[in-house]
From Swiss-Prot:
Gene: TNO1
Record-annotated disulphide pairs: none
Transmembrane regions: 1749-1766
GO cellular component, one term: trans-Golgi network membrane
Origin organism lineage: Eukaryota, Viridiplantae, Streptophyta, Embryophyta, Tracheophyta
Functional summary from the UniProt entry: Tethering factor involved in vesicle fusion at the trans-Golgi network (TGN) thus being required for efficient protein trafficking to the vacuole. Implicated in resistance to salt and osmotic stresses. Modulates the cell morphology (e.g. epidermal cell file rotation (CFR) and cell expansion) in mature regions of roots and the base of hypocotyls as well as root skewing, a process leading to root movement within the soil in order to maximize anchorage and nutrient acquisition, probably by regulating microtubule stabilization independently of their orientation.
SUPFAM superfamilies: Tropomyosin
Protein name: Trans-Golgi network-localized SYP41-interacting protein 1
Native organism: Arabidopsis thaliana
Tissue: Expressed ubiquitously in roots, leaves and flowers, and, to a lower extent, in stems.
Positions of region (Disordered): 1-72, 1177-1198
Topology in the lipid bilayer: Single-pass type IV membrane protein
Amino acid sequence: MHEKDDLPQDSIADGIENDDESNGQEEEELDPDQGTAFVDSKEDMFVDAPEELNFDTPSKEALTTDDDDNDDLGTHFNIEKGDWEKELAGLQEQFKLLTGENDLTGEDGNTTVDIVSRFSKFLKTAKEERIQHEVALKELHGVISGRDDEIADLTTKISELSSSQPVSEMGDQAQNLEHLEAATDRIMVSLSNVFGEGELQYGSSISEKLAHLENRVSFLGAKYTEFYYGADQLRKCLASDVLDLSFQEDFGSALGAACSELFELKQKEAAFFERLSHLEDENRNFVEQVNREKEMCESMRTEFEKLKAELELEKTKCTNTKEKLSMAVTKGKALVQNRDALKHQLSEKTTELANRLTELQEKEIALESSEVMKGQLEQSLTEKTDELEKCYAELNDRSVSLEAYELTKKELEQSLAEKTKELEECLTKLQEMSTALDQSELDKGELAKSDAMVASYQEMLSVRNSIIENIETILSNIYTPEEGHSFDIVEKVRSLAEERKELTNVSQEYNRLKDLIVSIDLPEEMSQSSLESRLAWLRESFLQGKDEVNALQNRIESVSMSLSAEMEEKSNIRKELDDLSFSLKKMEETAERGSLEREEIVRRLVETSGLMTEGVEDHTSSDINLLVDRSFDKIEKQIRDSSDSSYGNEEIFEAFQSLLYVRDLEFSLCKEMLGEGELISFQVSNLSDELKIASQELAFVKEEKIALEKDLERSEEKSALLRDKLSMAIKKGKGLVQDREKFKTQLDEKKSEIEKLMLELQQLGGTVDGYKNQIDMLSRDLERTKELETELVATKEERDQLQQSLSLIDTLLQKVMKSVEIIALPVDLASEDPSEKIDRLAGYIQEVQLARVEEQEEIEKVKSEVDALTSKLAETQTALKLVEDALSTAEDNISRLTEENRNVQAAKENAELELQKAVADASSVASELDEVLATKSTLEAALMQAERNISDIISEKEEAQGRTATAEMEQEMLQKEASIQKNKLTEAHSTINSLEETLAQTESNMDSLSKQIEDDKVLTTSLKNELEKLKIEAEFERNKMAEASLTIVSHEEALMKAENSLSALQGEMVKAEGEISTLSSKLNVCMEELAGSSGNSQSKSLEIITHLDNLQMLLKDGGLISKVNEFLQRKFKSLRDVDVIARDITRNIGENGLLAGEMGNAEDDSTEAKSLLSDLDNSVNTEPENSQGSAADEDEISSSLRKMAEGVRLRNKTLENNFEGFSTSIDTLIATLMQNMTAARADVLNIVGHNSSLEEQVRSVENIVREQENTISALQKDLSSLISACGAAARELQLEVKNNLLELVQFQENENGGEMESTEDPQELHVSECAQRIKELSSAAEKACATLKLFETTNNAAATVIRDMENRLTEASVALEKAVLERDLNQTKVSSSEAKVESLEELCQDLKLQLENLRVKEEKWHEKEVELSTLYDKLLVQEQEAKENLIPASDMRTLFDKINGIEVPSVDLVNGLDPQSPYDVKKLFAIVDSVTEMQHQIDILSYGQKELNSTLAEKDLEIQGLKKATEAESTTELELVKAKNELSKLISGLEKLLGILASNNPVVDPNFSESWTLVQALEKKITSLLLESESSKSRAQELGLKLAGSEKLVDKLSLRVKEFEEKLQTKAIQPDIVQERSIFETPRAPSTSEISEIEDKGALGIKSISPVPTAAQVRTVRKGSTDHLSINIDSESEHLMNNNETDEDKGHVFKSLNMSGLIPTQGKIIADRVDGIWVSGGRVLMSRPQARLGVMVYSLLLHLWLLASIL
């Protein structure tokens, strides 16, 4: 990167060594800026290197694309790149031939920036040389005017001498002497006008004056020859016919023409440089802007790729939704089919209903017939009953004795409880009859009859008993034993009748359910399976449909969310497209301007090179090589012609050998500029390639736009179709819903009718069954009458057995009665009747058992409550334990913090820290305080939680208080304890609040201390700065100020100790907080102990609270902090006074110079401060014992708290005492410091006054010495040497013109040699200087002409290229405008499609709501279907049994249990059922009816989902097309940004050229630096430079003519003074020759590297030294002898000499990254480091050529790698 920087600098160094040897050390002193120009240019190269690297390496992404068009562009780019490289190689070879630089071989990395920098260097050197020549011309003007005066005086004197010689010499000797003296006086007066007023003081005699005049005349002759020779050279350089004619008369015309031409060239050069720098800046800015736009476009590409991926995902989602919607459509179709099936089923039901009606009619007929039979049976029953009554009456009349038997029979029936009522009556009758037979055995016949009757009754009873036993056995098989015992036979029969009715209903419902299940379209496998499996399948299908509805709803929600996200993304993309279109418009405008500027630059460069006049006017990019070659050939020919015409022999070539070095430098700069031109053309080609790529991308955008339009049309069509489909689906759905509701109502009505009919049938059947039962009973009663007769006989036989059993029973009863009488009952329960007694005993036993059960229940409740209370107590205990753990952790943290504070204090005692560390420690302590506060807040939170827990416990205890007496007592105890704990907690909370207040106060105090510490730090830093200034300015008083700084450092150490003490105090505050935390932990422990033992804890808690109050009072004591604040205030006041004294010292030193006195040593009292600080630290570190310990018992807690309070009090006392001593020591130290500083100030004031008096004395002595030197020099000269001096001057002029001219041109002296040799021969020094300056002026004019021609050619080439670029940019802008219009149309279409999408989204929302409703219904129906399937399977299994027999009750119960598991919204409106029918039956019918509706809804939902998926897929396609369009636009924007950056670089290069040419007179407004205006300004500057060069040539010719006239006059004078030559030859020739040889043979200064010589100067004055040398208005050549020469230069060229260019104009200022405003505040440190690395790297590269070579090799390899990767 820096390889091209070394070559021009080496050539510059050689040129300075070989060409500028005559300038010497004097010009180095007067023009120190001359050598630093190259350093500045070097800095330019280092600063511009990163931009060049960015400029030379185009991005790989911009050149390598995946399309075939990009491959073609790559090949085209490689071809143009090879052409530019060839052109660059040719330019470099031509530059080598012109400059003679052989070291440039192998350079491939030269860029336009490097070439422009070389041209700028060359123009700088030309400007410097031009200024020197202008100064020399002014000096020559002064000398010529003096010489004219001298010639006039000499002519007058010669005329007087010639007129006075014919007169007698002896007689007129006195008069001649008087005339000679007058002539010498006049000559001296004339010389005083040239050499100064000191000429009048040389010599008092005529001989001395004449000797002095001889020396002056010889000097003037030498100067005249030099001026004449220089004017001749200028005349030859200017080469005008007018000058050739006028030069013989006046050689000053050549000088005037040269001056004017150089002035014009200088103006043109400055304008050209300014323009060129401006163009370079613009070009650089443009390239940067292009790079930024490239990066933006790349980011946009990535974003678009992401959007593409998202759109693809959305497409897949849309396809999925479409599929789901298609499935929903199919399901909807299935639902329609189900609707048709339901209609068919409804028709079947109507037919079935008609059949049922016919059956009802038949059953009514059967009922009527049964009623007839019922009437007949009733008649027969009445007859039979009449007969039976007669029989019973006869029996009653005949045997009264049977009543007792009947009574006994009743008693037996009651005891046994197994016989029927009729049997009991018979038994009682038999018992009565038996008793009657026993009592009265009146008639045997009557007894026989009675026995027969009894036998008949017994037979009847036995028959009846057998029937009853059979019924009981049958019923026992049906019912359980418990049910059999609990019910009698009649009830059992009644229950059987009711069950029969229910079973008939269930069978009917079962049949209906079976028919409904059969009517449902089930698979073949399920249709053949059982009813339970069918119901299970229906339930599973219902649940599955419900899940599908949920899934569809979720998908619809996700689709809606994705659509909303896509809408947002579309809006963002639209905004980004608008921004990109705006940026594209801007880039098009800039690209158009850049192309126009480029073309104009190329055109102007071609015009300035002069090729336009030769027929080379129009050039394309392919002819630039030929144009540049021809321009360089022309320049080379001009240089050769000028060199051949100027000198005709080898001696002249040797004389201009030094000028060839300068030309080498010029051509190296030209070569660099041409390289930059090639780079610019390369960039232009890159821009053209990028524009082609942009055009291709625009075409691609158009294609994508067409595709987008097609996609939009398709999407619109699809959206229209979707809308139609959705509207149709909605209409169909609404119609289906309405049909479904109608069918439901019809089905409900039919069902209700069917249910009513079924109920009627059931009622009729029940009545029929009742009649049948009555008939059966009557028939059975008739049969039983016969059986009763037989039973009477059996009863007689059993009578005896019963009597025996009764006797046994009587004995048992007597025993039982005796045992009952023995039982002792309460008074309330006592009674005489044993049965009542037994009953009461049974009731009492039952009551006792119930009381026991209740007591057990209450006990269990109490136990449960106690368990709950214990669990809650355990929870509170665990919470308290957690609080204790938190407190223990807080204590550990606090102890750790205290240990860390102790370690910090120990470290502070060992090492003396600075104030910054003290502030950092204070901040760390503050942070630790914050941590402690945080822990305290956590403890408070824990305490609050404990209070809450306790309050919860209290509330729970209050609730449990009213349950049991024991629980109430425990509750009261716990409540009391809790209240006590609550009071203690409130007290602890108050103490913690007080502690918080104290901590807040301490924090405020610490904040004030930290602020004071910061102020102290500021004061100390200011003191350090002032002391450093004193050290720098007062070099002679360095020791005293060092002692003062030591004293200040000691005081700073004292301040540091004070800060350490403050930090110790802060540590003590932290320790106090730790103690507070320990106390709080102990309080918590005490609270826990109080929970166990409440008696002793109250008194001890009061003691703890008192101790805490004492600690709180101690902490609130702010005496120590107030003392610290007072001490710090006093300290800061004293330090402010010290600061004021130091400022007075520095101000006096700054005003009056160096210090010249010694200040008193400051006393070092650091030992005393250290001892006091150690005492203070020891006092701070003294802590009361057992402060950190935790008391094991409650007594020890109180004692430890008391000890802690006492320890804190003692600590405060010790701190106060030690702090007072420390404050007094600090005050004494500050007082001593004040004394020392006041003494130092007085000393400084005295020193300043003494220095001022010494300076005045030195000035007076210098004036005296100067006057003495003037008088001595005047006495040394004699007027008698005037004639010899004139002859020597003429001879010296001739010799110098003939022999010594070349030696004088080649003469170069170093600093020391120049001063030493100037003491021996001042005339020769001035002659060599003038000749050298004239030659430099001529060479500079030639160089300026050559560079102007080169600039003209390059400007013309650049103008043509810029014109081409502007045309291309206009084309690109037109295409871009079209693309923008198309994009706007696409956006309108997109907005319309978005509106459509929004409408579709609204429809989707509606469908979503419908789907949600349907999903809920579907879930319910699905559950019902599953349950129905199970029921159906069970019914299928039981179908055969149901046909023959009724369904068992157990199966029906399981069926209805499963139905109850299904949730149905409403079952009240089930058609075909009676409203009084059971709920389970209604639910079953509702489930069966809802299956078809759910299937239909599922189909509708699946269809809607498919349609939504299709719409989503279409919208995904639309979004993807829009993203592709935005990506294409981003690529075009990237390419346009690239072109803009390259044009900005080109414009910045032109601005730099203009800046170099215009210097401080800007031609273009800096606020409006457009490229076209820059090109125009550059053209104006070049033309002005050409005009200036022409005027300088004419002026040089005029000066040459003036010199020729003066030479003629000198020749005339030399002829007249031939008689004086013989006397002066022996005196002047030999010393002159010796001096010249010695001067010419002086060794040159060692040719060291100029970079090493310039390094220090460049490092010290990068900003202060301007690249243009500022010539002083008076240049003096100081000599060691008494001969002094001062040449006064008029102020005509002040505006040229003082035209100092600032570093900012040249780009030499190193601007930091932080000053640029581009770096945020977070990255300032990194930016400073980068700046430091940059500057240090620049210095290293300046001082180490190996590093430069390494960097160049690395950059070359990097370029090769990039080219390989691109190709």
